[in-house]
Amino acid sequence: MLSSTRYYASYRATLTKQLMFLTKADFTNDDEKWLNAFGNLLRQWFQIEDWKGNHKKLLDDLKRRDYL
């Protein structure tokens, strides 16, 4: 369990660095801003790509759960 927690923390730190670089914003201690920026990044990512099959199911699931 501890290793998965470390992995998650490392993964989130990496995503945060990437998001701060892309958005030029500092939101390391603000979960709402972080989630909004991540949602915007996902939204742009899905708009750029031509999603079919399982990717469309994933997008529909994210929209249904109000992540996008």
Curated annotation (Swiss-Prot):
A Pfam family this protein belongs to? Phage_C
- Classification via InterPro entries: C-protein
Extra facts:
Phi KhT, a host-range mutant of phi K, can grow on E.coli C and B, besides K12, and is more thermosensitive than the parental phage phi K.
What's one GO BP annotation on this UniProt entry?
viral DNA genome packaging
Q: What is the stated purpose of this protein?
A: C protein is one of the proteins involved in the production and packaging of viral single-stranded DNA.
Q: What top-level branch of life does the organism fall under?
A: Viruses
Q: What is this protein called?
A: C protein
